[in-house]
Amino acid sequence: MSSYRGGSRGGGSNYMSNLPFGLGYGDVGKNHITEFPSIPLPINGPITNKERSLAVKYINFGKTVKDGPFYTGSMSLIIDQQENSKSGKRKPNIILDEDDTNDGIERYSDKYLKKRKIGISIDDHPYNLNLFPNELYNVMGINKKKLLAISKFNNADDVFTGTGLQDENIGLSMLAKLKELAEDVDDASTGDGAAKGSKTGEGEDDDLADDDFEEDEDEEDDDDYNAEKYFNNGDDDDYGDEEDPNEEAAF
């Protein structure tokens, strides 16, 4: 009996003995499953025109930023490039594809992908150098010789407005040159007129002589096509009027 009682007392420490009165093992299992209430998830409806336009604008904006000159790419790749560059020499920029990925594997299809560089230097940015002071050119890495060479080119407005110099001698010299050109043109025109006049006088005499010669030829040539000139009807012939018996017949 003692052993049974001890066994029963020892068995009272099991999981079922700790349950409240009126609850069973099945109730505990159900409560464990339904500990968090089930929430019905919403079902997305069809996309509207406004949502579609916003999505398209967002995608286009991202492409525009990536294709712009101020896009530096992924910052993690730039940091890795700076950490890996142990020497102070400048290494070539990393070239990425459209998805900003560079797995290091060269493929034949890579030549059809759009490439972009990260870590662009200051020379590649379209800065307006006129807005920066000259003291910052050395820090920005701008070559002064190159800048001076570019500044030598004239602007497009100079072609129409001139060089902007207010020198009267330049205007006078231009007027003098224009007058000389006008005089040369007048002299050339008068010389050409006199030469043409002399040539026309000689030409008129030649024309008159040619006309006289042509008239004589016409008079001589008028009877060339006169058939009556070469036709003889026999009226002027004396054959058959008188017969001379002493004359022999001519064959």
UniProtKB/Swiss-Prot annotation:
Bias kind Acidic residues: ranges: 203-225, 234-251
GO BP, one annotated term: transcription by RNA polymerase III
Pfam families, alphabetized: RNA_pol_3_Rpc31
Phosphoserine PTM sites in chain numbering: 189
Region called Disordered, residue ranges: 186-251
Major subcellular site: nucleus
Highest taxon listed in the record's lineage: Eukaryota
Keywords annotated in UniProt: DNA-binding, DNA-directed RNA polymerase, Nucleotidyltransferase, Nucleus, Phosphoprotein, Transcription, Transferase
Subcellular location: Nucleus
GO cellular component labels: nucleoplasm; nucleus; RNA polymerase III complex
GO MF, one example: DNA binding
The keyword Phosphoprotein appears for this protein: yes
Nucleotidyltransferase recorded as keyword: yes
Other known facts: The acidic domain is essential for its function.
Functional note: DNA-dependent RNA polymerase catalyzes the transcription of DNA into RNA using the four ribonucleoside triphosphates as substrates. Specific peripheric component of RNA polymerase III which synthesizes small RNAs, such as 5S rRNA and tRNAs. C31 is involved in the formation of the initiation complex.
Subunit composition and interactions: Component of the RNA polymerase III (Pol III) complex consisting of 17 subunits.
Family designation: Belongs to the eukaryotic RPC7 RNA polymerase subunit family.
PANTHER family named among the record's database cross-references: DNA-DIRECTED RNA POLYMERASE III (PTHR15367), DNA-DIRECTED RNA POLYMERASE III SUBUNIT (PTHR15367:SF2)
Protein name in the entry: DNA-directed RNA polymerase III subunit RPC7
Gene source species: Saccharomyces cerevisiae (strain ATCC 204508 / S288c) (Baker's yeast)
Gene that produces this protein: RPC31
